[in-house]
Amino acid sequence: MLAVSLHFSPTFMKNKPTLELADLKAVAAAAEAEALKNKWAVTIAIVDDGGHLLWLQRLDGAPPISAHIAPAKANTAAVGRRESRVYEEIINGGRFSFLSAPDLKGLLEGGVPILKDGQCLGAVGVSGVKSNEDAQVARAGIAALGL
């Protein structure tokens, strides 16, 4: 009989920063303020690092479809660890086969990852106005975290 004893030390476990509810509220409030300042009716989505929806806020007048597009942009930015704009540029550059990438649906500008010390905590996706304006709102929200 062979007996094996495994001991796991806490030093093997890594801690990673995560988004707390207070972070979500701060990001959403700052993003909303940016949108309202510019009179933009948008939907704001915040996801965790795995692309799972944590927050969805549709401002008055935002198009119904924006409630589908914003989370998709956020998901793409989180799981891809880069702005969704990068994927739009890849496709616009002629790499149409990238459209077959699994689980990437928000391939338009407006999804921005939330990065801290090189780690992705999640992402913000915004939809409802021009894509560069969506990204502006997302970045304004993330700036509230002071990362």
Give each language-model segment a name.
Residues 3-12:
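Short, Lys/Arg-enriched N-terminal segments with co-localized hydrophobic residues
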Residues 12-147:
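Flexible, solvent-exposed loop/hinge segments and secondary-structure transition points
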